[in-house]
Amino acid sequence: DQCTYCGIYCCPPKFCTSSGCRSP
């Protein structure tokens, strides 16, 4: 997978923002 970490893990299709995970 291509999960990214920004305080919590976000996996596609979600993505990291300054406030955490966000849906597309």
UniProtKB/Swiss-Prot annotation:
<protein>
    <recommendedName>
        <fullName>Conotoxin pr6c</fullName>
    </recommendedName>
</protein>
<dbReference type="GO" id="GO:0090729">
    <property type="term" value="F:toxin activity"/>
</dbReference>
<dbReference type="GO" id="GO:0005576">
    <property type="term" value="C:extracellular region"/>
</dbReference>
<keyword id="KW-0964">Secreted</keyword>
<feature type="disulfide bond">
    <location>
        <begin position="3"/>
        <end position="11"/>
    </location>
</feature>
<feature type="disulfide bond">
    <location>
        <begin position="10"/>
        <end position="21"/>
    </location>
</feature>
<feature type="disulfide bond">
    <location>
        <begin position="6"/>
        <end position="16"/>
    </location>
</feature>
<keyword id="KW-0800">Toxin</keyword>
<keyword id="KW-1015">Disulfide bond</keyword>
